[in-house]
A protein has these predicted regions:
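Internal maturation/activation junctions in enzymes
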Residues: 74-75, 236-238, 338-385, 389, ...
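Catalytic alpha/beta core of large soluble enzyme barrels
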Residues: 23, 299-301, 353-354, 460, ...
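Conserved, charged catalytic cores of large soluble enzymes
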Residues: 2-68, 72, 154-168, 178-290, ...
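Function-dense linear segments that define catalytic or interfacial modules
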Residues: 57-64, 77-154, 162-165, 176-179, ...
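Cysteine-rich micro-motifs
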Residues: 832-842
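Short, cysteine/histidine-rich loop/knuckle motifs that typically chelate Zn2+
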Residues: 820-824, 838
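Terminal amphipathic helices with adjacent charged low-complexity linkers/tails
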Residues: 218, 279, 284-286, 296, ...
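Short, Gly/Pro- and small/polar-rich lid/capping loops
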Residues: 471-473, 647-692
Length: 845
């Protein structure tokens, strides 16, 4: 029986109803989480379908164990993102048989033992790419690479150091498409490595290492030396008792460089490595393969090589009874029950992940390539499979901390609010670990559990002190999971829960958006006209839970308020002085440190700072983070990623050469390279052929893809050539040629004859402006402005826009467009997606 499919418009409209008119939440869900096949067919109409998909799959695993949860019970926990929210890959992948992909959000890779050869470096590069193509973020450490100038036994004679390999790994990341997005990569290095200063400076040159986040691993000895002004010894290998390279450095100067670069460009992040290792429960098993070496791309999961983690968030706001009212309270009884169930669901998801990895390995085995070609990928997944099953690591976290506090009448960043947050996270830790012990009774402990190994771990001893009976039960029965907790960023997740993100405060309770309007419509109010003459109406957008506050106070959220009235409303609300730019930054760092004591992995937090803060504040924040027991810290100074980053070796800005008009090639070459882009036009499968000249779009053809009158094209074909042919009678035609799997050339003749004439004429118009090198973003704007009557033509138009977006130069400003999340005009194109440089929100498609 063929499964029902939906058009984008059908799924969007149904999701819009589901999210009660929240356009951004609806688009995020359809674009990122609705199940689709490789042709773009959509198989889910709203998040309700998705939640049943997840509930049914988890219930299937539950049935293997005693006291199973039913699909109905699970659905009630998931429905409307109210209580338990699987994040990212689990939300997309559970029960999704249209992709052969992992359910893990993140991985760390590495090489055991000596790993400073080209072979080891390139092996990690291949492993990184293989994981990213399966939708995983990847982290790895570079401390194993020999410092620059070290002798090597090859034709180079001396090592190039680690910076060139940073660029290599970064480029590999950018090459890998994950559902239209680039991969996510974390590169780390120990401050003890002699090349760590070059690592810290690597991203200060414009355009370098743009495909990776970078973090430096700081030990306590370095932090002490930096603060006291004493020397610090770097060495290689970094952990060797008898290093081959040693040098003494001024720790204070290197610390100042870290602070300056973070102030200037938001990187590097800092990882307080001794704190991470000392607090890590998995590192009690370091000699059994669980030695932590790096973190995932956002920094919330420190991992050993070939381990992975899946993420889930608890919506804290939903446990506030009578929110924003004088009698509001937090329902700890329901909360404890749901944390236990969340830990159980996460353990079920490990079983689902093991099934997914088995399917990946079956596909690798069945692929026609030789065993030599497949060897690295096959061994990689085998290692991940074993590590996932052995440790059964989970990542139970939270979201909506800011809204929870506001709903209880507590102001984020105050001592009272921080004290309450600490109580909540202590409850999470005790409930999750108690659940893991209960599962050990029913399902068995993770196979290498050993109470004796963990007896001196500070985190385990905190649990022991808070709940002695829990510790005694853990000694008796073991624990199901080697580690359980994290706090991850919940960007798109929080858009769908319609709450604040992670443990962050609200970004803004009120902001403005613009929508394009017809200037001749007497029912609209024109607030802004851009430089092309398009008219826009501005409208106020309230943070969803700010609307709830307004309604409890008797204010009408549909009324058109003046700016003074809005300011007065915010001042009366619990969100006043509690936004990301308002909170006391040092208090926020201390709050992170206090919560970290109840999180066995780590916490991903960004401290948002206004543009005018000085470097000394960044210095004080980083030092306070170390002293407070944070495992890592990242700052973002408003606007610090825009503009030109100057190389550390040259503070003088180069003068830009005079602008030259783009080269126009009026006579079309006989053969052009071409990319294939598939899209939906209503319920029909269409294909676009984008002809390229020197990598730039030169022409576009589109047509129906079917077996009768349309185009027959294997789904694995993504590129080829468009060939212009002139027949003896002078008539012209365009053919498409590609190479099939067996290496033979296949030609599809007469593209123009296969297209509807109306579409053909519009495509000729678009090709004309492409040929004369109109900037791609302006071509897309032109296509979007076409006023067409036919619904089919309009959906075709959307497909053409999506096909062309991938060719916009990264970093191009989206002029005249505001971020729908924070309201700032700071959107840039990145890999065909719109990225906000202020708040980090993204939108693809």
């Amino acid at each position: 029986m063929e499964k029902q499919t939906y058009s984008y418009e059908e799924a969007y409209e149904e999701s819009l109803r589901y999210f009660q008119g929240d356009e951004l939440a609806a688009r995020v869900w359809v674009n990122k989480y609705a199940v689709k096949d490789s042709f773009g067919n959509i198989y889910e109409k709203s998040p309700k379908d998705m939640h049943w998909r997840i509930a049914n799959e988890v219930a299937r695993i539950e049935a293997k164990y005693s006291n199973p949860l039913s699909a109905e019970e699970l659905f009630d926990l998931l429905d409307h993102f109210k209580y338990i929210v699987p994040q990212g890959s689990p939300m997309t992948g559970i029960g999704n048989n249209y992709q052969v992909a992992s359910l893990s959000n993140c991985f760390v890779i590495g090489v055991d033992g000596e790993a400073d050869s080209y072979g080891a470096i390139f092996k990690i590069d291949e492993e990184q790419v293989q994981l990213m193509k399966r939708r995983g973020g990847v982290g790895h450490d570079l401390s194993h690479i020999r410092p620059k100038g070290s002798p090597v036994k090859n034709s180079a004679l001396t090592s190039t150091g680690l910076v060139p390999f940073m660029e290599r790994y970064s480029n590999s990341t950018r090459e890998v498409a994950q559902d239209g997005r680039r991969g996510a990569l974390m590169l780390s290095v120990s401050i003890k490595h002699p090349d760590s200063e070059a690592f810290i400076d690597a991203k200060m040159t414009e355009g370098k290492v743009t495909g990776a986040n970078v973090s430096v691993k700081l030990d306590d000895a370095f932090m002490t030396a930096a603060i006291t002004g004493t020397p610090y010894i770097q060495q290689y290998p970094v952990n060797a008792a008898e290093p081959t390279v040693q040098k003494e450095i001024n720790a204070t100067n290197l610390w100042k460089k870290i602070v300056h670069n973070a102030w200037k460009s938001a990187e590097p992040g800092v990882l307080f490595w001794d704190t991470i290792l000392k607090e890590s429960v998995p590192d009690c098993y370091a000699d059994l393969g669980y030695r932590t070496v790096s973190t995932n791309p956002c920094g919330e999961i420190p991992l050993c090589p070939y381990d992975s983690c899946r993420l889930l968030a608890i919506n804290l706001y939903s446990y506030v009874a009578n929110p924003f009212k004088p009698d509001a309270y937090f329902d700890f009884e329901l909360f404890q029950k749901h944390i236990a169930l969340a830990q159980r669901i996460m353990d079920d998801i490990i079983d689902l992940e093991l099934e997914k990895i088995e399917r990946i390995m079956e596909k690798i085995d069945a692929d026609p390539e030789s065993e030599d070609v497949k060897h690295t990928e096959r061994i990689l997944w085998d290692k991940i499979y074993k590590k996932s099953g052995q440790g059964r690591r989970t990542g139970v976290g939270i979201t909506a901390e800011g809204d929870m506090l506001a709903a209880l009448g507590l102001r984020y960043g105050t001592e009272e609010a921080t004290e309450f947050s600490e109580k909540v996270h202590k409850t999470v830790a005790l409930s999750a670990y108690r659940s893991s012990v209960e599962m050990a009774k029913e399902r068995g402990a993770f196979e290498i559990y050993d109470t004796e190994r963990e007896k001196n771990n500070p985190f385990i001893n905190r649990l022991r002190e808070a709940d002695p009976q829990l510790y005694e039960d853990m000694k008796k029965y073991g624990r199901r999971n080697i580690a359980c907790l994290t706090i991850a960023p919940t960007g798109t997740t929080s858009l769908m829960t319609q709450t604040t993100s992670g443990i962050e405060p609200v970004f803004l309770p009120v902001y403005k958006r613009r929508r394009k309007v017809n200037p001749n419509d007497t029912n609209v109010h024109i607030d802004f006209v851009d430089d092309t003459g398009d008219a826009f109406e501005e409208y106020i957008v309230f943070h969803p839970k700010f609307i709830t506050w307004m309604e409890t106070q008797g204010y009408d959220p549909t009324k058109r308020y003046t700016q003074d009235e809005i300011d007065a409303l915010v001042e009366r609300s619990p969100y006043y002085k509690a936004t990301s730019n308002d909170v006391d930054w040092l208090m926020k760092v201390k709050m992170q440190g206090r919560i970290q004591k109840w999180v066995d992995h780590s916490i991903s937090v960004t401290i948002n700072l206004p543009n005018d803060v000085d470097e000394d504040l960044v210095n004080r924040l980083y030092v306070e983070a170390w002293k407070s027991g944070c495992k890592g810290c990242t700052v973002y100074r408003d606007g610090s990623r825009s503009g030109v980053l100057i190389s550390a070796k040259n503070d003088k800005k180069e003068e830009m050469p005079p602008c030259k008009p783009p080269t126009v090639v009026e006579t079309r070459p006989t053969i052009l390279d071409a990319d294939i882009v598939r899209f939906q036009n209503n319920k029909e499968k269409w294909v676009a052929f984008v002809g390229l000249l020197d990598g730039h779009p030169y022409e576009i053809f589109t047509g129906l893809q079917d077996d009768d009158e349309g185009i027959i094209l294997p789904k694995n074909v993504t590129s080829g050539h468009i060939i212009k042919k002139v027949d003896k009678d002078g008539s012209k035609r365009y053919d498409f040629q590609f190479q099939n799997k067996r290496g033979y050339k296949v030609t599809i003749e007469g593209l123009s004859e296969k297209f509807n004439k109306e579409y053909w004429n519009y495509a000729k118009l678009i090709s004309g402006v492409l040929r004369y090198r109109m900037p791609i973003e302006q071509v897309i704007k032109l296509v979007g402005s076409l006023q067409l009557d036919s619904e089919s033509i309009n959906t075709w138009k959307n497909g053409v826009e999506r096909a062309l977006k991938k060719y916009i130069t990264d970093g191009t400003e989206a002029k005249g467009k505001k971020c729908p999340n924070c309201g700032n005009e700071t959107l840039v194109y990145q890999e065909g997606c719109l990225i906000c440089t202020t708040c980090g929100a993204s939108r693809c498609g």
